[in-house]
Amino acid sequence: MFKSSICNNKLNIEEIKEKGDLPTTQEELRQRRERAETLVKKKSLLSSGASIVPIPGLDFGVDLKLMRDIIEDVNKIYGLDHDQVNSLSDQVKERIMSAAAIQGSQFIGRKVSEALLKVVIKDVAKRAAAKQTKWFPFVGQAVSASISYYFMSKLGKDHINKCEKVINNL
């Protein structure tokens, strides 16, 4: 936690504490997208940095935490986190969950830990081969860092797109 806060301070990563209301205008949606994309870029850089450290397993543990953080923070930015969705009327909650199911998102309006394992298992299989490049000094670490950044960024951008589709379908 201490190291995480140091990295967050160095990269000036915004800590998402408040839970926003559902966006109602396209301008509001655009602002939230910018905020979410900035967060995803910075968290992806952290993932990339952890990949450079030649300690087996460190990058995997950091990636798990960052995946969870990205998904939870993006949900909060869009007003689609678990607690907020559950506080809405049953009709709105049902519409959000239906729209999320149509988008194929297991993360919107739910606790992240349940669905995260399914995604992580699929993601780890893809990364495992790429991470083996660490055994080739310097070049392997650079390749590993690039792959880590790409996958973390893709996960975040895909989740942002799904959140926006859910909002637009309400």
Language model features with spans:
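Terminal, membrane-proximal amphipathic helices
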Residues: M1-A50, L64-L170
